[in-house]
Curated annotation (Swiss-Prot):
Subunit structure: Component of the TIM22 complex, whose core is composed of TIMM22, associated with peripheral protein FXC1/TIMM10B and the 70 kDa heterohexamer. In most cases, the 70 kDa complex is composed of TIMM9 and TIMM10 (TIMM10A or TIMM10B). A small fraction of the 70 kDa complex is composed of TIMM8 (TIMM8A/DDP1 or TIMM8B/DDP2) and TIMM13. The TIM22 complex also contains AGK and TIMM29. Interacts directly with TIMM9, TIMM10A and FXC1/TIMM10B. Interacts (when oxidized) with TIMM29; interaction is direct.
GO process terms (BP): protein insertion into mitochondrial inner membrane
Record-linked Pfam families: Tim17
Membrane topology: Multi-pass membrane protein
Keyword Hydrolase listed: no
Lineage: Eukaryota, Metazoa, Chordata, Craniata, Vertebrata
Disulfide linkage: C67-C139, C158-C177
Family: Belongs to the Tim17/Tim22/Tim23 family.
Main subcellular location of this protein, as a coarse class: mitochondrion
PANTHER family to which the protein is assigned, alphabetical: MITOCHONDRIAL IMPORT INNER MEMBRANE TRANSLOCASE SUBUNIT TIM22 (PTHR14110:SF0)
Sample GO molecular function, one term: protein transmembrane transporter activity
Organism encoding this protein: Rattus norvegicus
Name assigned to this protein: Mitochondrial import inner membrane translocase subunit Tim22
Post-translational modification: Disulfide bonds promote efficient assembly of the TIM22 complex.
C-alpha cells in the first residue's frame, strides 16, 4: 500500500519539477519580467515613417500644452457641464417658479424657464471657476514638480478646495482642502 502511494506520487513530483510550459515562457518574454525593450523603430521594418514636425505644428503643440489653454478649456467645459447640471436640477425641483405669497398658484412656463435659466447660469459660473482653478493649479504643480502622477491632482485639489473654502473661514478652508484633495485622489485612482 505504501509502495503504491510512493509510486503514485513519484510522477506527480516529477511533473512539478519539470520545466514550465512553453506558453508560460512565451508570456514572460512578451509581457512579463523578461520582456526586452524594442530596439528597432517601426519605420525601419517597412512601417509608415512619420515626417518631422513643422514649426507650426510644434507651436500649436506648445500652445495646447500650456497651462493657460488647459485652464480655458476646463473653464469652458465646466461652464457647459455646470449649465446643463443646473438646468437639470431646476427641472426636477418642485419649487421652481413657486411663489410663497400665493402657494396654490401654478407657475407659468415663462417663470419656470426663467428660474431654470438663472439656476443654470449660476451652476455654470461656479463649475467654470472651479474647473479653471483646478486645471490651472494642477498644470502649475505638474510643471513645478516635473512629474505627472496622482500627487499633482491631490495637491491641486487641496489648493483649490482651500481657496474656495477660505471665503467662509480658516476651518472651512481646511475642510475644503481635505475634502477636495480626497475627492481628487479618488477620481484619479478610479481613472488611472
Amino acid at each position: 500500500m505504501a509502495a503504491a502511494k510512493a509510486g503514485a506520487s513519484a510522477p506527480e513530483a516529477a511533473g512539478s519539477a519539470e520545466a514550465p510550459l512553453q506558453y508560460s515562457l512565451l508570456l514572460q518574454h512578451l509581457v512579463g519580467d523578461k520582456r526586452q525593450p524594442r530596439l528597432l523603430e517601426p519605420g525601419s521594418l517597412g512601417g509608415i515613417p512619420s515626417p518631422a514636425k513643422s514649426e507650426e505644428q510644434k507651436m500649436i503643440e506648445r500652445a495646447m500644452e500650456s497651462c493657460a489653454f488647459k485652464a480655458v478649456l476646463a473653464c469652458v467645459g465646466g461652464f457647459v457641464l455646470g449649465g446643463a447640471f443646473g438646468v437639470f436640477t431646476a427641472g426636477i425641483d418642485t419649487n421652481v417658479g413657486f411663489d410663497p405669497k400665493d402657494p396654490y398658484r401654478t407657475p407659468t412656463a415663462r417663470e419656470v424657464l426663467k428660474d431654470m435659466g438663472q439656476r443654470g447660469m449660476s451652476y455654470a459660473k461656479n463649475f467654470a471657476i472651479v474647473g479653471a482653478m483646478f486645471s490651472c493649479t494642477e498644470c502649475l504643480v505638474e510643471s513645478y514638480r516635473g512629474k505627472s502622477d496622482w500627487k499633482n491632482s491631490v495637491i491641486s485639489g487641496c489648493i483649490t478646495g482651500g481657496a474656495i473654502g477660505f471665503r467662509a473661514g480658516v476651518k472651512a478652508g481646511a475642510i475644503g482642502c481635505g475634502g477636495f484633495a480626497a475627492f481628487s485622489a479618488a477620481i484619479d485612482y478610479y481613472l488611472r
